[in-house]
Amino acid sequence: MRTRLGQREDLALPARIPQTVKRAIRLATATSVLGLGLVAPTALAGTTAHLEKPGWVRDSHRALGAHDPRSPITHVVIVMQENHSFDEYFGMLPREGQPKADGFTFDSAGRPINSNPLPGGKRQLVFHQDQPCSGPEAGQSWNNTHKEIDGGRMDGFAAIEPHSMSYYDKSDLPFYYSLANTFTLANRWFSSAPAQTYPNRRFLYAGTAYGNISTDTSSYFDAPPPHGTIMDEFAKYNVSWHDYVTDLPDTALIGSNLENHPSDYTSIAQFYADAKLGTLPDVSYVESEDGAAGIATDPVRDQVGAAMGGSEPQQVKNAFYWSDGTDEDEEDSDVRLGQAFVSRVVNAVMSGPDWQHTLLIWLYDEHGGFYDHVAVPSAIKPDNIPPALGPGDIKGGYDMYGVRVPAVVVSAWSKKHAVTNVVHDHTSVVAEIEELWNLPALTYRDANAADLSDFLDFRHETFAAPPTLAAPNSADLTSCHTT
């Protein structure tokens, strides 16, 4: 059962202290730091003492679902792409525009010197990827991710796949580097679990993976999470939302979202129309092209078709296959296509009439198996549902984040050319939405997650006039797939 709304069991902190600071103080009492840099939960965190609980609301004096009148942000746009680590995309950023970015270590000649051991005693240095297809797949399964993290040593990547040590730079990703050098970049945004796409996206939609550790389409038929999803709260408290779909909606990875809210799914073309007209809903999930999701009878594909009245995009009607045109940034895809998609979405928001009232968060679901050097912190368990581990799975729980990923907040109120070192994960998006519309927390994780306050400065509208960003590299649809 949920905690009674408004119930507080936190530390006695003055009300004037910002929520982000309060959470940091609480978490400091609940964690300790090991010599390796891996943050480990203490008994206090294990018993959830001094933590906000599911059902907690941030403002007991404001109606549930009522927008915060103090905030100029009335629209949140979420653009979550696929499978890249911070260092793979932004390891070179300290030498290419943002010296405060926590990227690679460099020698006196400016060359990155981060490395990982290889079998046989040699070491693999990080190296520049010389073509736009980002494969081969480096390995982001539950077991591989735990091996890569290796207790916080972050030295297991190359042994699994040497190509995991590759990186891109500003010449490859001019638009992404322009985003990071213009707005506020997260130095400490971690995926929510050391696992693949499905569990990490469940955290974005429900604050928990509730047992899932892998990308398995059969999990679509799992029961809904115990406290529902943020989409259920949108419906209950009259917060408007849409999932703007190119071919497949990732929000439907929790099947109850599509089953319970079919009218909130619409086409990607409608996003651009709504952004231009100033008719975006309160919350928008903007989906790039997946390009593959199984076979022609995929259950998610069939549900999408039914929910959209048989009018799903042509890509969904076709038998599914890896497409040269996929723009979700999945490894093996042409990174120029993903960059072009994000550029279109960001520019649509910036040129629309609601720019001054919109917050866009661009981020990645997980690291795709690619190297990152920052030790992974411990995390608050979202609930009492453990991972559904098989006989060969490495023991572990949801009390640890996954590998660090890129994240930038784009807003007229974003701090200019800044970084935040606050620890965030995907439930920080949930926390920000809960903060803006005073929604009950779904799990312990989102109840205690840092929101997006540290990216923003509401004292100064830094970008009242939208900035001009670098154009993405043009893509010639280079074939990145052979199947």
Predicted regions and their residues:
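Basic side chains
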Residues: 2, 22-26, 75, 404
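N-terminal secretory signal peptides that target proteins for export/translocation
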Residues: 1-22
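N-terminal pro-sequences and low-complexity stem/linker regions of secreted or lumenal proteins
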Residues: 45-483
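Secretory targeting and sorting signals
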Residues: 16-46
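Short amphipathic alpha-helical "recognition" segments used for binding
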Residues: 11-13, 23-26, 365, 370
